[in-house]
């Protein structure tokens, strides 16, 4: 069935086009469109991501070189002008692509669900990455007086090892403000760094029946209500505490748990706050250690997909490009899982980047390609994921 299909077309066949079209209709994305549809736009942007195009002009040159293959790649019959793609990114509702990104994240999370920790319930890490922008080119993204930037806030499923939710803001907004956009699930665990010490939001997590683990700031004001006397190795404190600061006490009126842990590998001490009384102190520390997976995700995203350089200057264009990067990431994760590939996903992407216009079956491509010299640079795409 895939004998005469290009590799890129085989890859994008894993996506649910019907679902994407539902979002297009919802936001009237193809209104007044004659040739270059929203689906064509998505595939064109994904082709640019997977083939490592540096700019919009670079992407258009690539399509000009493959003019005869355009229709079968899924980007339409008509030649794509730079102004056509730029206008689509500028004017078409970014929510079409963001909603589809959420759909792809949900599908990837459900398919790749595993249990890397012996703790019942979903486990998420929430963090952000800042992408610097030129203020004169992106005036809407003002960060500091002479600097611009955007933040991508990501809720990362640490067991499926794909994002479960994300939101985009200007870099000037404090990290903790993004916590209000999360729909917390009962009995799930949410891991935060100390930038997310909003006691109002932490109390909302508690009232939802969810659990949090957050690293405490050094200026935390509290009183000890009860503490454990016998503790395992490297656990310095395991106590029930209550906030004493006037404002913080009003935001979080109940007691919670404070755990101080000494990490021998890093030779440093960590203090965690949590409402998960059912966990041991060592499980709390182990849960927080998994937060590094979201940092690896950000590093991988910036290194292998195009979000450091944007192909449009409007907020809408930036949001579309970030959404397409997330969609591409999830697609590769789904293909990697569905095909039970034994290669690292870095190898998969390297093979794809030079094979998108070949007519080799995906299975043959990944089984037969000699890629023994390719090493993962610093980390796998899905570190520790077992297939």
Where are these regions (language model features)?
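Single, function-defining residue in the core of a domain
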Residues: 1-58, 62, 92, 99-103, ...
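Glycine-rich loop/turn
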Residues: 64-71, 75, 178-179
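Short helix C-cap/helix-to-loop transition motifs enriched in small/turn-promoting residues
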Residues: 69, 95-96, 107
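Major-groove recognition helix of helix-turn-helix-like DNA-binding domains
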Residues: 72-92
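Catalytic micro-motifs at enzyme active sites that drive phosphoryl/nucleotidyl and oxygen chemistry
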Residues: 73, 112-113, 141-143, 201
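A short, well-structured juxtamembrane/interface segment
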Residues: 106-113, 175-176
């Amino acid at each position: 069935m895939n004998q005469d299909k290009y590799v890129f077309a085989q890859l994008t066949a894993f996506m649910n086009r019907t679902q994407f079209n539902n979002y297009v209709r919802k936001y009237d994305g193809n209104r007044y469109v004659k040739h270059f549809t929203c689906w064509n736009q998505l595939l064109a942007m994904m082709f640019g991501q997977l083939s490592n195009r540096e700019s919009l002009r670079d992407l258009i040159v690539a399509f000009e070189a493959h003019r005869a293959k355009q229709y079968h790649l899924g980007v339409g019959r008509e030649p794509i002008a730079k102004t056509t793609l730029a206008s689509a990114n500028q004017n078409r509702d970014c929510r079409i692509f963001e909603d589809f990104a959420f759909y792809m994240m949900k599908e990837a999370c459900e398919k790749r669900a595993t249990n890397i920790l012996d703790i019942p319930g979903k486990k998420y890490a929430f963090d952000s990455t800042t992408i610097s922008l030129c203020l004169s080119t992106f005036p809407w993204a003002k960060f500091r007086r002479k600097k611009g930037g955007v933040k991508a806030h990501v809720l990362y499923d640490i067991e499926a090892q794909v994002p479960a939710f994300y939101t985009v803001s200007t870099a000037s907004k404090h990290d903790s403000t993004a916590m209000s956009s999360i729909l917390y699930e009962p009995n799930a665990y949410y891991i935060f760094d100390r930038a997310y010490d909003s006691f109002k939001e932490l109390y909302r997590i508690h009232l939802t029946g969810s659990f949090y683990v957050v690293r405490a700031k050094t200026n935390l004001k509290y009183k000890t209500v009860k503490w454990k006397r016998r503790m395992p190795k490297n656990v310095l404190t395991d106590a029930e505490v209550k906030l004493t600061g006037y404002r913080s006490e009003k935001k979080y009126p109940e007691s919670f748990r404070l755990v101080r842990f000494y990490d021998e590998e890093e030779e440093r001490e960590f203090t965690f706050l949590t409402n998960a009384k059912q966990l041991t102190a060592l499980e709390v520390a182990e849960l927080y250690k998994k937060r590094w997976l979201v940092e690896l995700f950000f590093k991988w995203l910036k290194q292998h997909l195009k979000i450091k350089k944007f192909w449009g200057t409007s907020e809408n264009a930036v949001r579309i490009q970030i959404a397409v990067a997330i969609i591409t990431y999830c697609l590769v994760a789904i293909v990697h899982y569905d095909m039970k590939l034994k290669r690292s996903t870095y190898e998969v992407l390297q093979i794809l980047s030079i094979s998108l216009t070949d007519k080799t079956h995906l299975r043959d491509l990944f089984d037969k390609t000699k890629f023994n010299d390719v090493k993962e640079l610093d980390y796998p795409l899905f570190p520790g994921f077992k297939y």
